[in-house]
Structures are given as structure tokens and as C-alpha cells.
Amino acid sequence: MAKKNKARLLVKLLSTAGTGFFYVRSRPKAAPKLAFIKYDPKIHKRVLFEESKMK
């Protein structure tokens, strides 16, 4: 039996402040790349988090 193709991806949202802090979210495969302004606890500020590759 063939494996079912997943419609959603797990993506890593990495802080643009360079602290290395990240969130993991899921998004549809057809959607554009994610970017959020969220809280970075290492610098105690809200910063932009952009999608990067998961290892």
C-alpha cells in the first residue's frame, strides 16, 4: 500500500534577532512562506520570525 502524501508541512520559524530561538508550526504545502512577529525570550522583545529549513 502506498504512503499517503501529507498536505501540511512542519516548518521552523527562526528569530531574525540571531539568538537561535525558534518556534515550530505547520502550514499547507501550497501556502507561501510564513513570517510572524512573536516574542523572543532570550532578548525579551518581539521580533520577526521567518521560515527556515528543519534539519
Curated annotation (Swiss-Prot):
It holds the Pfam family Ribosomal_L33. The keyword Ribonucleoprotein applies. Its main location: mitochondrion. One of its GO terms (biological process) is mitochondrial translation. InterPro entries: Ribosomal_bL33 (IPR001705), Ribosomal_bL33_sf (IPR038584), Ribosomal_zn-bd (IPR011332). It comes from the Eukaryota. Disulfide bonds: none annotated. One of its GO terms (cellular component) is mitochondrial large ribosomal subunit. One of its GO terms (molecular function) is structural constituent of ribosome. The keyword Protein transport does not apply. It is found in: Mitochondrion. Keywords: Mitochondrion, Ribonucleoprotein, Ribosomal protein. Component of the mitochondrial large ribosomal subunit (mt-LSU). Mature yeast 74S mitochondrial ribosomes consist of a small (37S) and a large (54S) subunit. The 37S small subunit contains a 15S ribosomal RNA (15S mt-rRNA) and at least 32 different proteins. The 54S large subunit contains a 21S rRNA (21S mt-rRNA) and at least 45 different proteins. bL33m stabilizes the tRNA acceptor stem in the E-site. Belongs to the bacterial ribosomal protein bL33 family. Component of the mitochondrial ribosome (mitoribosome), a dedicated translation machinery responsible for the synthesis of mitochondrial genome-encoded proteins, including at least some of the essential transmembrane subunits of the mitochondrial respiratory chain. The mitoribosomes are attached to the mitochondrial inner membrane and translation products are cotranslationally integrated into the membrane. This is Large ribosomal subunit protein bL33m. It comes from Schizosaccharomyces pombe (strain 972 / ATCC 24843) (Fission yeast). The lineage of its organism: Eukaryota, Fungi, Dikarya, Ascomycota, Taphrinomycotina.
